[in-house]
């Protein structure tokens, strides 16, 4: 028996060394309707339980709002029994997740850095180095530290003139949300090269702290091994790695005993053993706190669902400026809709689902950055986290338009100078 365990461990190590990728053949995604509190409780419990193997692409929130669940083949019978025993109704949304993964990237991409495919961690870092060298008059390389696996967390400060107020963009804190990082690099390029007068105005009237990948370990792992990896890669448990960095911030953090996060290290919403236990979040917070006089807006980029959320996620209590945050969000959503008709919904975060220890609750509640928003990019669920690369540019275009609307309305209401 001991020999078997040793040999199995060696095989696993060799598999990781040669870059064997996890496959998701015949993994299915179902949309499950939630009609009563008993059904909702089962889904909450299922999301938080150890080794459940179910991946909630759209989380349980409240009665009347459906969830999306990825079900592995070996759980198909169990899933069917859960659906039957509690009279759930469900529909098959994605019959084979691996097919979407195989089709996510173009078959014959052009050479050079462009926005026709999703780029690896190394390629993004190389591109950041290149554009800093090419635009050293307005770009400064910045870093807020190192990840658990000693990956430098690199970004840029874009500044056309001294004294500008600043906007901070945090992206790819959830590593499987590839569209977030691709959109962020596109925005950097547009801020540098666009001749559109509205883009030029927001690029040059504000300083921009931009970090395309704030969870580099997870992002690298999502390319090399497990496309659906969400968390960091830290070790707090013998069997399961990582914590959800967007449940790990130290404002109203909770240990996972409530509905806003999990205390199970194997859960995708594991809050970590303590606030800021993750290097990626603690160092980010320190970076922001050192610049709170400068940073006037904080944006957190995610996917999917086509939403724009503002604080709070941990409580139903409204921010004192909730009406303005809603109005600014609606102005952003209206501008976003114009290029392609994409309809974003604007919410207080808690009205969608309870999420404790998230970044925008911390920036608003602890760092005092009133204009704190989280985007959930395309799509509405057809592809989920596996948005085809041919949607990178359309998504980026509409997000840029939303930033124009958001900044214009924030200025009009007196929240930006």
How would you describe each model-predicted region?
Residues 2-7, 13-417:
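M14 metallocarboxypeptidase catalytic domain recognition
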């Amino acid at each position: 028996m001991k020999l078997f365990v040793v040999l199995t461990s060696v095989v696993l190590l060799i598999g990781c060394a040669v870059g064997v990728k996890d496959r998701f053949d015949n993994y299915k995604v179902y949309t499950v309707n939630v009609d009563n509190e008993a059904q909702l409780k089962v889904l909450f419990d299922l999301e938080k339980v150890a080794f459940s193997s179910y991946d909630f692409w759209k989380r349980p929130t409240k009665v009347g709002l459906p969830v999306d669940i990825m079900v592995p083949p070996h759980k198909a019978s169990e899933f069917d029994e859960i659906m039957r025993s509690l009279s759930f109704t469900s529909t098959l949304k994605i019959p084979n997740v691996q097919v979407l993964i195989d089709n996510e990237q173009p078959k014959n991409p052009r050479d050079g850095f462009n926005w026709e495919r999703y780029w690896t961690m190394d390629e993004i870092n190389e591109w950041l180095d290149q554009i800093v060298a090419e635009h050293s008059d307005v770009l400064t390389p910045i870093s807020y530290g190192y990840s658990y696996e000693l990956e430098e967390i690199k970004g840029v400060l874009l500044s056309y003139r001294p004294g500008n107020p600043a906007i901070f963009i945090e992206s790819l804190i959830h590593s499987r949300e590839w569209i977030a990082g691709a959109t962020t690099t596109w925005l950097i390029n547009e801020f540098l090269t666009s001749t559109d007068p509205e883009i030029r105005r927001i690029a040059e009237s504000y300083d921009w702290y931009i970090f395309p990948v704030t969870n580099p370990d997870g992002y690298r792992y999502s390319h090399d091994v497990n496309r659906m990896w969400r968390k960091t890669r830290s070790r707090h448990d013998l069997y399961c790695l990582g914590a959800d960095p967007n449940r790990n911030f130290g404002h109203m953090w909770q240990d996972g005993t409530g509905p806003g996060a999990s205390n199970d290290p194997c859960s995708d919403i594991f809050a970590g053993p303590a606030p800021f236990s993750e290097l990626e979040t603690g160092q980010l917070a320190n970076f922001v706190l050192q610049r709170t006089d400068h940073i006037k807006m904080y944006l957190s980029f995610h996917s999917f669902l086509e939403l724009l959320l503002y604080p709070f996620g941990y409580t139903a209590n409204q921010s004192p400026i909730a009406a303005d945050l809603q109005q600014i969000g609606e102005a952003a959503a209206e501008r976003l809709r114009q290029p392609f008709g994409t309809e974003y919904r604007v919410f207080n975060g808690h009205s969608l689902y309870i999420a404790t220890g998230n970044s925008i609750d911390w920036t608003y509640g602890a760092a005092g950055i009133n204009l704190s928003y989280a985007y959930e990019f395309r799509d509405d669920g057809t592809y989920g986290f596996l948005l085809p690369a041919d949607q990178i540019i359309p998504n980026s275009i509409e997000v840029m338009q939303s930033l124009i609307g958001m900044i214009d309305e924030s200025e009009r209401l007196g929240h930006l100078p």
